[in-house]
């Protein structure tokens, strides 16, 4: 009966461990239980505990040894804890120590403090809804080392170079395993993925002559980088050197704060050229640096010797030293500005009299700045006035009529004759209208030069027209009567 209880308890332990349902106290309790109950023939592999799903492969061989009373007591505690866990609440366990000789140690009450063994901890909301989980090793993201995948990558050349270096190292350190080109191709095929793997698999390689690794790398350069390394490798390298020289010539440094970025770009292109040309490119590099370039070039010519002539790092070191000097000088200048000259009592007598004009400090009037208001002042909206921005009408009388022909074509309103105005009319003194015109001029009125104005003129005009009509009618009647008489 005891053996069946032990097996059942251990099986439940492994089942709960796989589902992350055990608390720390339950985990420690079951480990101690297995240590006490298992004999030397029983083996449990606990090395694979921090796996992905916390599933443990164990090899157990049960024996027919009797279980001690202490283990039965612990099993009873475990069964009660399982019943509580089935009810939906997390059980609370107290840490119980177990002696090898037998018997359990129950924590004793200290002076003034209740026993933790008998005291129940009050559950909080966090403990009920978010039960604590056993501490485990976090899952580590496994990355495939040495795998080449250049699908949709921008730095393809860097990836190919790193992969080729690793493949070459594997082949050279294990020459006995990679004597056959087939094995090398198999290794390269398993170390690639994507389009690179398809290239190695579908290409017919020359396995008799040449280095198979170099063939694969040259073909990758041709297919993925557009460099014709397979057919004309020398011409491609010469073309790269020419592009690097043009790039170094075009590089400029306008701000000394970008010295590191400028040096990195220049150095990357310089190492694509021949080693014998390095001193000339270093002098060109120093001539492009502002502020400290001349001093650094002078120091480089005096201090460089041997292999340091070909070293751009040596020149970078000199530039950093010159920059540190300028930085220290600027710090000292800032300190001198804060230095109070009045505190220094040791002064030499001036040897110049009247050489320097004393100048007073210019007074700058501080402009008044309106205080900021948090609220917007309310202004009453003014009533709309039409014609506010237009020129007002003149109150004087109308101006004289403009005669565009340059001569007086207007008709005089006194004598109704064209050729002169009313103020120049010779009949104005003898006529009553002339007296009216004189009185109007005294008041400030001017005559209107439009003809046929006034009641009298219109009447006269109509009267004259009627007289003319009657005369024409009489003439017509006379002509008609004469014709009738002739016909008779």
Swiss-Prot record:
SMART domains: ZnF_C2HC (SM00343). GO terms for cellular component: host cell; host cell nucleus; T=7 icosahedral viral capsid. Keywords: Capsid protein, Host nucleus, Metal-binding, T=7 icosahedral capsid protein, Viral penetration into host nucleus, Virion, Virus entry into host cell, Zinc, Zinc-finger. It comes from the Viruses. Residues 80-93, 464-488 have a biased composition (Acidic residues). GO terms for biological process: symbiont entry into host cell; viral penetration into host nucleus. The keyword Repeat does not apply. A zinc finger (CCHC-type) spans 410-427. SUPFAM superfamilies: Retrovirus zinc finger-like domains (SSF57756). GO terms for molecular function: nucleic acid binding; structural molecule activity; zinc ion binding. Residues 78-137, 463-488 are annotated as: Disordered. It is found in: Virion; Host nucleus. A motif (Nuclear localization signal) lies at residues 120-123. Residues 94-129 have a biased composition (Basic and acidic residues). InterPro entries: Caulimo_coat, Znf_CCHC, Znf_CCHC_sf. Belongs to the caulimoviridae capsid protein family. Self assembles to form an icosahedral capsid, about 50 nm in diameter, nm, composed of 420 subunits of the viral capsid protein. The capsid encapsulates the genomic dsDNA. Following virus entry into host cell, provides nuclear import of the viral genome. Virus particles do not enter the nucleus, but dock at the nuclear membrane through the interaction with host importins. Interacts (via nuclear localization signal) with host importin alpha. This is Capsid protein.
